[in-house]
Amino acid sequence: MPSSEASPAAGLSEDSTRHLPRILCLHGGGTNARIFKAQCRQLSAQLKRDFRFIYAEAPWISIAGPDVLAVYGQWGPFKRWLRWSPEQPDITTQETVKELDQCLARAVEADNACGTTGEVVAILGFSQGAKVAASVLYWQQRSGQSLGLRASNSGYRFGVLLAGSSPLVDLSTCEGDSNGLSENAWPGDDMIGPRALDCDTHKLIIPTLHVHGLQDRGLRLHRALMEDFCAPESTTLIEWDGVHRVPLNRAEVSRVAGQIRKLAGLTSNS
């Protein structure tokens, strides 16, 4: 079993990271916050002097995601943000938005209780978490509301989307303004259906970094999220020779970390 409890900011005390800007992290479907913290260990280590990472836990119990049991089989319970199997019960848009907001807020508030003062400046997600992260950014762009953040925070300035699939999901809770959540939550599934947002009229302009594994079976859908739903002038792409996982190789992680620093600088309020 891999070691999980080592701090992602090894070499720095907790006190020394409390002032840093924060990145809110959303795990993939069929995993959980503890697993995602382990999966992000190299990235958080390379950014330990720049950002404090906080990890949100999805609201609904799930079966384990693809390839999760082989490494993290004893790390349950596993959670999901959206339906990713036809056997899972459907959830109303209103219920999903409420639970999503509460889960993100809980993670931020728990970190606030540690005495942190840094603003939450970005949202990062992997797989289903990236799909949700992009949708949260779009909802902020459309409504001016930042799910999970309260009045003291000015909103997410950028997003980091690791292997996120098309399409965006509609988080609008206004009856008549939404057909509900996207039904395209299954990895590699082409089903779009009436609940998906139309890429011709919905473009995310908040800056996003997209990280795509060239051996990932879902690569076509990952490219579609970037090309069809994100404005080209606000996107940055990193491709790496990997499958559907968070990069761990030092050189690849260094590229991602460098672009995150760059985005943070470009979107800084100072």
From Swiss-Prot:
GO terms for biological process: secondary metabolite biosynthetic process. GO terms for molecular function: hydrolase activity. Pathway: Mycotoxin biosynthesis. Keywords: Hydrolase, Virulence. Esterase; part of the gene cluster that mediates the biosynthesis of the selective antifungal agent ascochitine, an o-quinone methide that plays a possible protective role against other microbial competitors in nature and is considered to be important for pathogenicity of legume-associated Didymella species. The pathway probably begins with the synthesis of a keto-aldehyde intermediate by the ascochitine non-reducing polyketide synthase pksAC from successive condensations of 4 malonyl-CoA units, presumably with a simple acetyl-CoA starter unit. It comes from Didymella fabae (Leaf and pod spot disease fungus). It comes from the Eukaryota. This is Esterase. Belongs to the LovG family. Pfam families: FSH1 (PF03959). GO terms for cellular component: cytoplasm; nucleus. It is an enzyme of class 3 (hydrolase). Gene3D superfamilies: alpha/beta hydrolase. InterPro entries: AB_hydrolase_fold (IPR029058), FSH-like_dom (IPR005645), LovG (IPR050593). Its EC number is 3.1.2.-. The active site is at S127, D216, H244.
